[in-house]
Amino acid sequence: MTIASTASPVPAAAGLDRQSRNRRALRLWLGLVILALFALVLVGGATRLTNSGLSITQWKPIHGVIPPLNAAEWEEEFKLYQQIPQYELVNKGMTVEAFKTIFWWEWAHRFLARSIGVIFALPLVFFWATGRIEKRLRWPLVGILALGGFQGFIGWWMVSSGLSERTEVSQYRLATHLVTACLIFSACVWVMRGLARHSADPAPTAHSRHWAIALLCLVLFQIYLGALVAGLDAGMSYNTWPLMDGALIPGDLLVQQPVWLNFFENPKTVQFVHRIGAYTVLLVALYHMVSSLRAAPGTTHARRSVVLFAIVCCQAVLGISALLLQVPLDAALAHQGGALILLGFTVAHLRGFYGAYPLPKPVA
């Protein structure tokens, strides 16, 4: 009598369960990193809006973690600040106590940045060493870590632009710094979303995917424009809506020569372009939602497009409110936070077109 032997499903099931647990751990880790990045960008925004970014005039990646601890150290730090143009031309006569306020914003921003490096690097090493990271994700995660390290250099490059001749940082370098932060944020959201389960709904059309890609690019570009607005204090140029001081198109948008310079250095032009960018994002999000509802009604993809359009509308309201209120700190930070939420959801929405990362075959 011959007895047929079959492979037991238990090892395979155990392997899949282990992979699911590993993915859940990675999602929790990346979720923590994303929340920390969100906080970092908001603190960075507050640092810029309170003109605190030049309060620390030296780059000490390790020793700089420790702030001044006594009166003598505060005086020493304050003397360094008194040597730059911002103090001489903007804050002449500032007291040590007033200096402490702007110092703590910049210190908190740098401390958060260093902390995120630790929060990302140490778990990455642990997960890699214990085999919890799938091979396809190892080098992309290392790439994110490397980009984070490079972001530290970009931050100092930005600060250094305001230490010799200018009284504020270069808006070009500020925009580079913010966009790089958004790329790191987006990459973490992309990987985290790929590790989660996806809907079993039919795959969306290529047409919808192309528009989702376009929307993500527009959101990133709009954030870049927002950084130029912040760097030039362009939010104070026109504080009316929908018109700009009574006109749809003001007459002083192209006063600088050469003409292209207006789009980067004329505060009025930069605000105008940022407004046009917002309208463009709104229209593209509306079209994407309508086309998705028509092509795939009732699917998760279509519902996501509705949520995405709603977030765009909320962000537009936040932007208009900040403008009409003449850009108070709380309204400006709410608008910046809204931009990050919009960016994160747009990335997650686009990731939904590609589904979750396939699970590796478990080793029996």
Swiss-Prot record:
Membrane topology: Multi-pass membrane protein
InterPro entries: COX15/CtaA_fam, HemeA_Synthase_type2
Residues binding heme, per UniProt: H274, H335
Transmembrane segments: 25-45, 111-131, 139-159, 174-194, 212-232, 270-290, 305-325, 327-347
Protein's UniProt name: Heme A synthase
EC number: 1.17.99.9
GO biological process: heme A biosynthetic process
Presence of keyword NAD: no
Reactions catalysed, as given in the entry: Fe(II)-heme o + 2 A + H2O = Fe(II)-heme a + 2 AH2
GO molecular function annotations of the record: metal ion binding; oxidoreductase activity, acting on NAD(P)H, heme protein as acceptor
Gene name for this UniProt entry: ctaA
Compartments where located: Cell membrane
